[in-house]
């Protein structure tokens, strides 16, 4: 079973996290969001622990990080995840511009 963490559990993130939680081939092991209300709502629905982004990056159990944050954070988060040997699923758009996309490509 593939172990996931979801970063950003607002409108899209909660939907993505719910789909992962309901999959018989994946396990949702952590959620993360800077908005405390989003975290509390997601924990109530999903019954999954909160972890900070740094904790998720250091957690060897987590194989895939699903990034559902505002677009301005995508590039940095993707690269940080890749540096930590995490697989990444990122909501669209991948990033804000071609330069950011090139940096992600160059790192990967």
Where is each model-derived feature located?
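N-terminal Rossmann-like dinucleotide-binding module
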Residues: 1-46
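Beta-loop-alpha module in the N-terminal Rossmann-like domain of NAD(P)-dependent dehydrogenases
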Residues: 48-105
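A generic structural signal for well-ordered alpha-helical segments
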Residues: 42-43, 81, 108
């Amino acid at each position: 079973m593939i172990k996931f963490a979801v970063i950003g559990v607002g409108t899209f993130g909660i939907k993505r996290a719910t789909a992962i939680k309901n999959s018989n081939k994946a396990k949702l092991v952590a959620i993360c969001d800077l908005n405390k209300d989003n975290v509390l709502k997601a924990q109530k629905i999903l019954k999954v622990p909160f972890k900070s982004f740094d904790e998720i990056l250091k957690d060897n159990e987590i194989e895939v990080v699903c990034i559902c944050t505002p677009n301005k954070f995508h590039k940095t988060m993707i690269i940080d995840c890749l540096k930590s040997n995490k697989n990444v699923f990122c909501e669209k758009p991948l990033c804000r511009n071609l330069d950011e996309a090139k940096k992600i490509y160059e790192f990967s």
